[in-house]
Amino acid sequence: FPDLSPRADDERKPAPLTRAASLQAALGTFEKHMQDEGFSLNTVKAFASDIRLLGRYLGIGTPIGEIGTKNLTDFLHWLTDERGVPCSPKSYARRVTALKVFFGWLHDTGVLAQDPSTAVVQQSVSSPLPSAPTAVDLERALVVAEARRAGADGHKPDARPTLLLNLLLQTGIKKGEAMAIVPNHIDASDASAPMLYIRYANPRLRYKERKLPLEPEWLRVLDEYMQQYRPSDTLFTCTARNLEYVLRDIAEAGDLPVGALSFENLRWASAMRDWRAGVEQDDIRQKLGLSKIAWRETKSKLQKLIDHEATTMA
């Protein structure tokens, strides 16, 4: 390692932000803050773009301490009525969120005595509620999968439907994460408490890596699957589309509604199971691999799904 003198080391450290810092200088520090906090890559890019747009309106060299609530309100009015570029309700809502996160961070870290974004009104944007299979749907699906596993009706025994369905319900992982699993990501050293490690090759996505518990019975299904398919690389030897077909076939055989089983729907079903079981909300967030920003909307939708389910069952 190079022998850096204290002076040389100090020169490498960015100067602390003050209220006199420019919007551009604050944005650079804000981007690093978002990365350190585990914001998703898309969120970092979107929020940075939104703050640059504010800089385009106010002037990128504007001192952050001179930006008030009226400046932000005027900026939002410019976005919707004067800029000449369409601003959808969803984009508008995200930009308001970007302002609140940016100036809230400046206030929380003591750079600004007051948060000018506090009084900015966040307009709600209605987005469709996701669908998730009901408990009855899942029971039917699991019965079908177990029948396939046992080789019922003269079919060749196939453990893959049971393996896939239970994997998604127990972990809530995404399709891409499922496709990236290799057998050594599964820790079966303690058969009573097996674990799945979700890995990412991209260093910028390492914050999404996590360890997820699996039920012991799943290991027995895994053993059958490994004997039947003998994967040489990734756990699933087929394409993602083929796995989607597996889920679709289970749904059809179980007489479930069209589209009831998908990677996305089962991810919601997994989160709902944890929510009903009283799992801590931050534990659910981490299980799903979501940033704190992304969790806000997901949490709201989960609550609505649970409420809708309760109303339907009443």
Task: Name these PLM-found stretches.
Residues A180-W218:
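Conserved tyrosine-mediated DNA breakage-rejoining catalytic core shared by Y-recombinases
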Residues L142-K175:
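Basic, Lys/Arg- and aromatic-enriched nucleic-acid-binding interface segment
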Residues A150-G151, S232, R248-Q286, L290, ...:
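Short, basic (Lys/Arg/His-rich) helix/loop patches that form interaction surfaces
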Residues V44, L99, L164-L165, G172, ...:
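Alpha-helix N-cap/helix-start motif at helix boundaries, enriched for small hydrophobics
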Residues E11-R12, G28-N42, A48-L129, A150:
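N-terminal core-binding DNA-recognition domain of tyrosine recombinases/integrases
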Residues L112, S126-V144, L205-P216, P231:
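DNA breakage-rejoining catalytic core of tyrosine-based enzymes
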Residues G110, L167-A180, A277-V279, L288:
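A short, glycine-centered helix-capping/turn motif at helix boundaries
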Residues P213-V258, S270:
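Active-site/catalytic core of tyrosine-dependent DNA strand-transfer enzymes
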